[in-house]
């Protein structure tokens, strides 16, 4: 029986080519700030429709550096509670105050109505997280809201490389965007990230901060920065992935459509709402289970009996994490309810269409056997 992991990087049989390029790098001695970084930044700015791109050592670093460039010290930044902790931690590390918002269960992304309630005179901006690579219409509505209130919009696009809503491309919707190249992401270099922006002021400040705060054109250090740079070796790996981005997204969408077709809204499952104008990247495929289904029982059966992994993440929610203990009594009811029933199915390139069909068949079989026959809801 084929074992299917929750996530796994795929290199299109480019391992030898990557190894040869890295070998040349090792012989050249040029392992930092070289031509591969420049090429990666140039190609990312084109791919994500922005004027500028800055390579950094992680997606979390990308957010932190952007927030420092946006000068959020002692100001509030609205973030969804359902996200990886790096989103909120970056606000704190940049000197700001994270204000946690509820999520819209239909999209898994930040709830606009809660955002509207929490914008005040202290608000510097909003971070929009494209959860699981879903690109909802609400990002366009949020852009208008931020512009109206004269606050920034930062895209956390860790899951959304190559996504779009209509003609709006992820990476050039907000004032800046942050992508992750972590091992399990849509594109990977093992570790790493990229900042995109069409604002030269933000670009120049970010470029300085990642290089210890040094001015780009002279020996003076104007900011309290650090070494947040990506290496040439990581850039080689990222470039090898970037050339296949369309193929990667096409595959993930093909797998997602199989899940959509075979795990219909019924007594057991509930799908997220997907807009016809959304070009999603499906970092993973999210689906809600009904209250009667035990996630732990389901996962054990999927792994032991059928050989595939069902995952869930971002639990506890950010406002329930010990590092944000002062926020723990905050009531974000939608997120607190849905996080307990959310599971994720694999969409990576080692999952073939036949595997996805088998996963659906096995999930339906488990639920029927344990929880009764299907009934419409």
At which residue positions do the language-model features occur?
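Conserved PLP-binding active-site segment in aminotransferase class I/II-type PLP enzymes
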Residues: 1-72, 128, 142, 147, ...
